[in-house]
Regions:
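Hydrophobic, aromatic-enriched alpha-helical segments typical of multi-pass transmembrane helices
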Residues: 1-200
Length: 200
């Protein structure tokens, strides 16, 4: 039980580090896609290592979410877990599709990974919105902050699914996602596993 809490909270903190690294790496790479794939391969130790580390962090987060879903029989955590499972599919696509592959294959893997990641995050964030809508763990003001952040970011990813925003626009909401992950970490630390949230 404590392991699930540790996994959820620790991964929610660590993922902020990998998001920061990703934004930094994105700023260093070429803007033209073909040149970017070449740049990624030339610096594969950095990119591959980053994605492997993030993959492990996301696995930790997923384990925590699945445990909470089973422990509480919670719809919120079931939605969150489903989103995490979809997100996990992104990493094998990048790790297997980018390294030393022709541009056409790398581009296909990139489109698949991006689409999977966007849909996974949409489901994950909607699950968080549902969780914080009913949760009584936080004080009212923090609950409203969590609801606002999860609502805005969910809507942003929905706009990406529809096509009104692009994946490149996601950098704009990155600070909001960072803050939401920190709130998630606090939730994992504060919640008592003996409590049952049948209404979630």
């Amino acid at each position: 039980m404590k392991t699930a809490k540790i996994f959820w909270s620790l991964s929610s903190v660590l993922i902020n580090i990998t998001i920061g690294i990703y934004i930094y790496l994105q700023s260093k790479g070429p803007s033209i896609l073909a040149e970017r794939f070449k740049y990624i391969n030339e610096n594969w130790a950095v990119y591959g290592g980053h994605w492997k580390a993030e993959f492990l962090i996301m696995i930790m987060m997923t384990i925590g979410a699945i445990y909470f879903a089973l422990h509480w029989k919670s719809m919120s955590w079931t939605i969150i877990s489903m989103g995490q499972l979809i997100i996990l599919l992104t990493y094998p696509l990048m790790l297997g599709g980018y390294q030393n592959t022709p541009f056409e294959i790398a581009n296909m893997a990139n489109q698949m990974a991006t689409t999977t990641f966007i849909f996974g995050n949409l489901v994950f964030l909607l699950g968080l919105f549902h969780l914080y809508l009913y949760s009584e763990i936080f004080q009212s003001w923090l609950r409203y902050v969590a609801l606002t952040l999860s609502g805005i970011t969910s809507f942003a990813f929905l706009l990406m699914v529809i096509g009104f925003l692009t994946w490149g626009d996601a950098v704009i909401i990155a600070p909001l996602v960072n803050l939401l992950y920190l709130i998630n970490a606090y939730y994992g630390w504060k919640v008592k596993l003996t409590e049952v949230y049948s209404h979630q």
